[in-house]
């Protein structure tokens, strides 16, 4: 079966959505499917090569691609995905942008007028938010919609597939012992939407007001630079990220908008607890996330982890083990990818789920 994965941004952007498409392509190819990726050239970054990451998967980037496939999986972008596609195969709309589901996000993100939202979300984010209502009508033109299980109640369509993301748990695993220096990690874009300002405030409060002897580390920025007590790690390739997660004592995921952050799965699978913002998108059954509201809530959770590590080590390590076990049980590639294969076969053949 020929599967086309059609993405709204260049894979060179290398955000969470792009990473998901790369992993899905490799996993489907490993299941014997003939997979091609077609990307629009939005957000293209020079000097980033992705074809070497795809193995036998064909990758094409451009406008109005001629898509030849039995079924197409389209990361939905309002009023653009269909206009910029020429594909006759049955289509599955994939809801990966959190701004298409504003009810599941931090409502403070959407306060203010267009100028405020443009500043917080950027041009494409604001565009998606303002058109999310029209998107619900446009989705009728797709044979099916894919949404993550905890978000399906926010999606209106006659045929919704509730499938989680997945991870290669043999690759993402504990590879380092936790040393005695407590390390707190942020992984992601340094954007307001991602809550990087909250991480900075958390570091300032924890180190300053409470005097926690901890290192606060963040990917991105200029390597070696220290600002407000946060050490910048620069770009961290995936091979090194596995070790980074594993050696950290806590991962902070304070994003204000999300569908399902891969950071959560990567960290838990690597044996590290995750403190995440308490938004509907993070209320994930079966995953032992430590949910927190604002800086004060995250600070309380962090202090609890800090004290647990130094005063009740076995309880802390049990929390680490529980996180990995939950990912292996419900989100491993072996468990989840066959569900995607079944979805594509049903949509391509016109069968009911």
Language model region names:
Residues 99-101, 110-144, 152:
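Membrane-proximal helix-turn-helix segments that form the acceptor-binding/catalytic region
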Residues 157, 164-181, 243:
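Acidic anion/phosphate-binding donor-loop and adjacent secondary structure
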Residues 176-194, 200-204:
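Conserved donor-binding/catalytic core segment of Leloir-type glycosyltransferases
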Residues 235-236, 243-248:
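Short alpha-helical donor nucleotide-sugar binding micro-motif in glycosyltransferases
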Residues 256:
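Aromatic "clamp/platform" in nucleotide-sugar-dependent glycosyltransferases that forms part
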Residues 273-276:
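Short hydrophobic beta-strand element within catalytic cores of glycosyltransferases
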Residues 311-345:
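A charged, aromatic-enriched C-terminal amphipathic alpha-helix characteristic of glycosyltransferases
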């Amino acid at each position: 079966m020929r599967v086309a994965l059609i993405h709204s941004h260049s894979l060179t952007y290398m955000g969470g959505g792009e990473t998901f498409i790369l992993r899905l392509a490799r996993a489907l190819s490993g299941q014997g499917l003939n997979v091609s990726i077609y990307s629009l050239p939005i957000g293209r970054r020079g000097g980033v090569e992705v074809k070497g990451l795809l193995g036998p998967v064909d990758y094409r980037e451009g406008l109005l691609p001629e898509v030849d496939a039995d079924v197409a999986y389209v990361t939905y972008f309002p009023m653009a995905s269909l206009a910029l596609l020429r594909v006759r195969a049955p289509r599955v709309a994939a809801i990966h942008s959190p701004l298409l589901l504003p009810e599941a996000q931090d409502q403070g993100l959407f306060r203010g007028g267009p100028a405020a939202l443009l500043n917080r979300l950027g041009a494409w984010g604001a565009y998606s938010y303002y058109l999310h209502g029209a998107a619900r009508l446009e989705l009728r033109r797709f044979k099916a919609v894919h949404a993550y299980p905890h978000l399906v109640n926010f999606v209106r369509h006659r045929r919704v597939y509730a499938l989680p993301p997945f991870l290669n748990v043999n690759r993402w695993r504990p590879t380092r012992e936790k040393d005695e220096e407590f390390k707190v990690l942020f992984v992601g874009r340094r954007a307001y939407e991602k809550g990087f300002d909250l991480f900075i405030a958390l570091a300032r409060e924890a180190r300053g007001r409470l005097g926690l002897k901890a290192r606060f580390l963040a990917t991105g920025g200029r390597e070696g630079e220290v600002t407000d007590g946060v050490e910048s790690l620069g770009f961290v390739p995936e091979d090194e990220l596995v070790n980074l997660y594993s050696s950290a004592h806590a991962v902070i995921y304070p994003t204000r908008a999300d569908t399902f952050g891969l950071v959560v799965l990567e960290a838990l699978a690597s044996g590290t607890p995750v403190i995440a913002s308490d938004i509907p998108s993070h209320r994930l059954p079966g995953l032992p996330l430590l949910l927190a509201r604002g800086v004060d809530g995250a600070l309380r959770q962090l202090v609890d982890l800090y004290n647990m590590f130094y005063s009740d080590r076995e309880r802390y390590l049990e929390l680490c083990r529980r996180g990995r076990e939950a990912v292996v049980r419900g989100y491993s590639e072996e468990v989840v990818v066959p569900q995607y294969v079944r979805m594509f076969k049903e949509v391509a053949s016109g069968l009911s789920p």
